[in-house]
Each structure stands twice: as structure tokens, then as C-alpha cells.
Amino acid sequence: GIEVIDERFRELVSDVSEVRRHWKGAEWSEGAVYLPEQNVIVWSDIPNNRMLQFDPESNETTVFREPSNFTNGNTIDREGRLVTATHLTHCVSRTERDGSITILVDRYEGKRLNSPNDVVVKSDGTIWFTDPPYGILSNREGEERDSELEGNFVYRLDPETGDLSIVADSMDRPNGLAFSPDESRL
């Protein structure tokens, strides 16, 4: 069964809904996001260096991108484009409508990011992401190397100006991000 913690969940899922497994085969899955224009759910399978997509109409799971550069977190921006945190290329990128990939940020003050992990887009269009060391600790989910930064941070990126700022610097290994419904809390 489904345990409902927040009653607003019932606005999304009916009482007769059931949880079903549609696919198995990922070593571990991260960053699931629904792409409404394509009507697919995309997610990362980090150690297998690929992204997968599930099509609810055909009930099929296929490869979305391989290799994926050890992608982790995914979300969509206000225009419905896929925004991805990537370990191997130490960046946050955006998949454009034509399928090309734009690197939005890969450095802070000239130093390579560690391994962007999770990412969310606020209603004002800013992109917030975590940058722990997971993807630089071994070659299993990125590239083993020393960090160029003095810590592991949560960042805010303004995609219009390119301005990148640290919004949290006291966490050892920041991971998942979400805003409260009114965006007053991260």
C-alpha cells in the first residue's frame, strides 16, 4: 500500500492507485524526472554511465543517453528543458530542444566543481545544485581526482547572467535538494 504523509498527495494520485515496478536492471537509479513534451520519465543509472527513459504509453524502457558522463540529478527548467548534474564533466548542463547539450557551469572562481549531484530549478529560473565529492572519490561513478575547491557546497546559478554563488557552505557532503511549496525553505 501507499502511506500518505501529506494530504496534498491525494490531489495527484487516486486512492485506487497501486505501486508497480515497470523495469529493473539499473545498478542504482537517481534523478528521475518527467519530461512532459516527450511524455517520458528519464533517470540516471550512475555506475552504468547511462540515462534511461520510460515511456508509459508503450510500457518500454530504453536508453536515453549512453555514455552519460556519470549523470546524477535531473530536473527541468521553466521552458521544459532537461537540466542535469554530471559527475565526470563536473558540470550542470542543459539538453536543448535539438538534443545538443549546453554546459551551464563547470567552475567556481576558476576551479573545477567536484561532482554536481542534485539539482532543482526555482520558479524565478535560478538553478540550485549540490556539489559533494562522490564523483571524484573513485572511477566507479566519475573520475578519481583531488578536489580543487576548499569544500563541498550548495550553489545558486543564474542562467541568464552566469552568476554562480555559494548558498550553503557548512555541509560535509550535501546531497538532495527540494524547495517547500512556497519556496521559502530549501
Functional labels for PLM-detected ranges:
Residues 1-186:
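Sequence-structural signature of mature extracellular/luminal beta-sheet repeat domains
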